[in-house]
Amino acid sequence: ELHQPKSIWSTFKNAYLRRKNLKKFWRKLDKKNLPEELIKISDLFIKSESYKWTSKFWRHNIINHYKHIINTPASEDTLNAIACSDYAGHSFMDEYSIEKSCENFKDKIELNLNLFKKHPQLSLTKSISHNLILLILYENIKSKNIFKNYDKIEKKLYLKYNPSLEVDDKVITQYMLTSLLEYEKIKILTNSINRPLNILELGAGYGRTANMILSLSKDVKYVIADLPPAVFFSKKNLSNYFPNKKIASAFGITDKNEMMKAFKENDILFVFPHQINLFEKKSFDVSLAI
């Protein structure tokens, strides 16, 4: 597993005190099972300014991610465990959140789902807890106007990396609904803009927020600034699910004019965090770090 339960001190020590020589690890790593594009992205990252910006905590995580990728059989999805542990995860129960979430529909829920559905990546106890949280989230969003967009959502990404339930003849996941609520907030904040949005997302994980926005917004320009291997996976996912979009990487660009040219010519652009400085001021209507 990527993470075994540890004490708070052990977690802190591993993340912040122990030296994590990611450069040395990458140099010595047997890369024969890694995708060629991921190797190229990682080589550029190790030599970039973004590497210097990366915390010990994330260097520790990235080392674990590469170890997991090379040890995962070709028949399995290498991203699944990483997405669940570090790029997303699942929400479980705490008393305050449950009370606040249930205020509007207490005693009104009619169960029409398999609440005891066991998910492969979760224990039965965690599966039931997850299912209850998902049901509560659904009850909070199903009557909102934003939920009318359900049929437009590209759902394959969420179903691939999140446990799902079928409720009212709709297949839902936690991160599908969470991303839809995030999209609702973005629409509220940008309702005065009467043209396609330019969006920058810092740290997109496997691409869940981008997937929602690209599903529901026409002609949006989207830039993702992230570290490998996450940026490789989000690019792969969005390329698969939005084949008609112009998608490019700009990891090797060092010139502002060249970066702005790539920005104007593509719908989705992938960069390292330090390259944000290569975009002109006011290039973006929305900046996200979720």
Regions found by a protein language model. Name each.
Residues 221-227:
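Conserved SAM-binding motif I beta-strand of class I
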Residues 287-288:
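Hydrophobic beta-strand segment of the Class I
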Residues 194-205:
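Conserved class I S-adenosyl-L-methionine
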Residues 237-280:
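S-adenosyl-L-methionine
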Residues 1-172:
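N-terminal accessory regions of S-adenosyl-L-methionine
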Residues 176-196:
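Conserved alpha-helix/loop element of class I SAM-dependent methyltransferases that forms part
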Residues 196, 283-284:
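Local beta-strand N-terminus motif with an aromatic residue
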Residues 206-218:
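Conserved SAM-binding loop of SAM-dependent methyltransferases across substrates and taxa
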